[in-house]
A protein has these predicted regions:
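Beta-lactam-recognizing serine transpeptidase/beta-lactamase-like catalytic domain environment
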Residues: 1-195
Length: 195
């Protein structure tokens, strides 16, 4: 591990990340403070830690935008959030949320990508028929958006080396390295005027 860190050996970390899996990468990154505010007394960004849930959320927004701008579904709707609160949203977002809550590519068993695509296309077609959307071009684009929401091996490998959707602040990285060299003890950082 020391040599891999010293040499910045991506291949070592690709393999380590692949073996760990994204859920463990997320768990350990959070333990080291990645993707969250550090507690400094100045305003700061929390950075961003790429996760399966965030990838689906990003695709939900993208699909909502496509439904509103290209398919042409306008207006507002009320959705109920996971915590039970109601929220006013674009109707297109409510439809996208419905699509992504009912169609989860990871739950299907399939022998080929085309088999998975066809299965999702059928479900998209059924849901969008409720909104009078029957144009194959629209249905195919929405199906592809859902296909693209799958977390795949390359996402895990990218996450393992801090690439992809990850974004950290310099203070998060300094705090991470400090924790690493101090045997995993994470301290809250603070600013000093003079050393």
């Amino acid at each position: 591990v020391r040599e891999a860190i010293r040499d910045s050996c991506n291949i070592f970390f690709y393999e380590a990340g692949y073996r760990l899996g994204v859920d463990n990468i997320e768990k350990y990154a959070k333990e080291f403070g990645i993707g969250q505010r550090t507690g400094l007394e100045i305003s700061e960004s929390s950075g961003y830690l790429a996760t399966k849930a965030d990838k689906v959320q990003i695709r939900t927004y993208s699909t909502s935008d496509y439904i509103r701008r290209t398919v042409g579904i306008k207006g507002n709707a009320i959705i109920t959030n996971e915590d039970g609160t109601e929220q006013a949203v674009y109707k297109s977002y409510a439809i996208a949320k419905e699509l992504y809550s009912q169609i989860t590519p990871d739950k299907y068993e399939y022998n080929s990508i085309s088999q998975l695509y066809n299965r999702i296309f059928e479900e998209v077609t059924a849901i969008m028929a409720k909104y009078n959307v029957k144009d194959n071009v629209y249905l195919q684009k929405i199906t592809q958006q859902i296909m693209d929401s799958r977390w795949v091996t390359t996402d895990t490998i990218n996450a393992s080396i801090g690439q992809g959707g990850n974004s950290t602040t310099p203070i998060q990285m300094a705090n991470f390295l400090s924790s690493l060299v101090n045997g995993g003890i994470r301290r809250e950082p603070y600013l000093v005027e003079k050393a």
